[in-house]
C-alpha cells in the first residue's frame, strides 16, 4: 500500500494527551502499541526528545525504515507549567535531531547555517525577537520582572534549557 497521507505514529501517552497536538505536527497523530506491528499507513514515528522512553519507539521505527521526528517544548512553551495543565503555545518538531543535542545536526541548526535559504525569514525573526524582549516573554512566562539594581557587582549569566 502506498503511503500518501502524513500519519505520525506515537507510542507515548504523554505526547498523545498534549492539547491540540495535531495543530503542531506535520501529519495526523495516531496512537500505537509497542505490541503490535506498525500500520503501513504510518509515515514516521514521533518521540519526545531523547527521553529514555523514546528508545524503544526509535528502535521500532528504525527496524522498519521509518524516520523519527523528535518533539520538545517550544522556546515559548506556555502561560504556565505543562504539569499544571497549561497547554503548549509551541512545540519544536525536528526531523533531523533536536536542538540541544550537538552530536547530530538539528533542523534549527541547519536553518541557522543556511544563510541564503533563511534570508526570507530574517525580518520575521527580527520582529519576533523584538516582541519577546519588548513583552518580557519567557519559556513559561511566570517569572517576575527583573530590574537590575543601580549598583550591581559583576555577574555570570547561566543559561539552561
Regions found by a protein language model. Name each.
Residues 1-161:
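Catalytic-core helical/loop segments in enzymes performing group transfer/polymerization on anionic/lipid-linked
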